[in-house]
C-alpha cells in the first residue's frame, strides 16, 4: 500500500506541499510515500507530520486496504475523511452568524450591563453638607442609658487575691506570707501535720519549714539572726548544721 499526496489529478506534489518543510518532504518521492509493509508501522506522529506539510485543501490518497486505526490517526491529525482512502486538509474559517433581526428580538433575557449595577448604589463618600441643611447627629445620643459596660469584678470579697490580680493585692499577700513564715520560725512553731521533719515532700503548702532540709523528730529548729548558716559553694549552697540545729541568716 502506498500514500499519495495531490490537490487534484493534474497538480504536482509541489502544489500540495509546503516547500518550507524540507526535512519532511524527503519522505516523499515521485508523488508516492515509501512503501509501508504493515499498517501498524504508521504511527500518529507520522500522520501529524504528513498533515503539517500539506497545504490548505491538500489531498492525501491512501492506496490499499485501510483499517480503522489509520483513519483515526489521520482524523486526529486534522484531516477530513472523504471516504475511499481520500483525506483532505480543510481550512478552518470563523464566520459571523447572520441572524435576522426579528429572531434576534425574540431572544429571551436581557444583557446586564456593568454600568447599571453602579447607578443605584449609595455614595458613601458623599460630601457632608455643612450649611445646616442636614441634621448633625449628637454623639452623646448614640449611647443608651440602659446599656452599661460590665465592670471588672473586685477580689475584695474573696479570701485570696485573683490569679490575674492587677490591683496589687497579690503582691501584698505574698509579702505578708513571707513575714508570717519568718515569725513562725522565730517562735519555733510546729504545724499540726507532724510531718515537718521529713522534708518538703511531706510538708503542707503553708508549712513554715518549707525549703529547709529534713531533721530528726523532736529537734528544735531555731532562726539565729547573727549566725551565718549558708556558705557559698561553687555549685550550690549547703545548709550548715551545728549541734542538731539549723542556722538561718536573715
Swiss-Prot record:
Keywords: 2Fe-2S, 4Fe-4S, Cytoplasm, Iron, Iron-sulfur, Metal-binding, Mitochondrion. A motif (Cx2C motif 1) lies at residues 193-196. It is found in: Cytoplasm; Mitochondrion intermembrane space. Its main location: cytoplasm. Residues 1-104 are annotated as: N-terminal SAM-like domain. A motif (Cx2C motif 2) lies at residues 204-207. Residues 193-207 are annotated as: Fe-S binding site B. [4Fe-4S] cluster binds at residues 193, 196, 204, 207. Residues 155-167 are annotated as: Fe-S binding site A. One of its GO terms (biological process) is iron-sulfur cluster assembly. Pfam families: CIAPIN1. Component of the cytosolic iron-sulfur (Fe-S) protein assembly (CIA) machinery. Required for the maturation of extramitochondrial Fe-S proteins. Part of an electron transfer chain functioning in an early step of cytosolic Fe-S biogenesis, facilitating the de novo assembly of a [4Fe-4S] cluster on the cytosolic Fe-S scaffold complex. Electrons are transferred from NADPH via a FAD- and FMN-containing diflavin oxidoreductase. Monomer. Belongs to the anamorsin family. The C-terminal domain binds 2 Fe-S clusters but is otherwise mostly in an intrinsically disordered conformation. The N-terminal domain has structural similarity with S-adenosyl-L-methionine-dependent methyltransferases, but does not bind S-adenosyl-L-methionine. It is required for correct assembly of the 2 Fe-S clusters. This is Anamorsin homolog 1. It comes from Paramecium tetraurelia.
Amino acid at each position: 500500500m502506498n500514500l499519495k499526496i495531490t490537490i487534484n489529478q493534474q497538480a504536482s506534489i509541489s502544489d500540495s506541499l509546503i516547500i518550507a518543510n524540507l526535512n519532511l518532504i524527503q519522505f516523499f518521492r515521485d508523488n508516492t510515500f515509501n512503501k509501508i509493509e504493515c499498517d501498524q508501522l504508521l504511527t500518529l506522529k507520522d500522520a501529524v507530520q504528513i498533515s503539517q506539510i500539506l497545504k490548505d485543501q491538500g489531498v492525501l490518497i491512501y492506496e490499499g486496504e485501510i483499517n480503522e486505526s489509520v483513519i483515526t490517526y489521520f482524523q486526529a491529525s486534522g484531516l477530513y475523511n472523504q471516504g475511499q482512502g481520500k483525506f483532505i486538509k480543510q481550512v478552518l474559517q470563523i464566520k459571523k452568524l447572520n441572524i435576522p433581526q426579528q429572531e434576534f428580538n425574540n431572544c429571551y433575557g436581557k444583557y446586564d450591563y456593568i454600568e447599571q449595577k453602579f447607578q443605584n448604589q449609595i455614595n458613601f463618600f458623599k460630601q457632608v453638607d455643612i450649611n445646616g441643611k442636614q441634621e448633625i447627629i449628637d454623639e452623646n445620643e448614640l449611647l443608651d442609658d440602659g446599656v452599661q459596660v460590665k465592670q471588672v469584678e473586685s477580689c475584695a470579697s474573696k479570701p485570696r487575691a485573683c490569679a490575674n490580680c492587677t490591683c496589687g493585692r497579690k503582691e501584698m499577700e505574698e509579702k505578708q506570707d513571707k513575714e508570717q513564715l519568718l515569725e513562725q520560725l522565730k517562735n519555733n512553731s510546729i504545724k499540726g501535720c507532724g510531718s515537718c521533719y521529713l522534708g518538703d515532700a511531706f510538708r503542707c503548702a503553708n508549712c513554715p519549714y518549707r525549703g529547709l532540709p529534713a531533721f530528726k523528730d523532736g529537734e528544735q529548729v531555731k532562726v539565729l539572726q547573727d549566725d551565718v548558716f549558708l556558705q557559698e559553694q561553687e555549685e550550690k549552697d549547703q545548709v550548715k548544721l551545728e549541734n542538731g540545729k539549723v542556722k538561718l541568716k536573715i
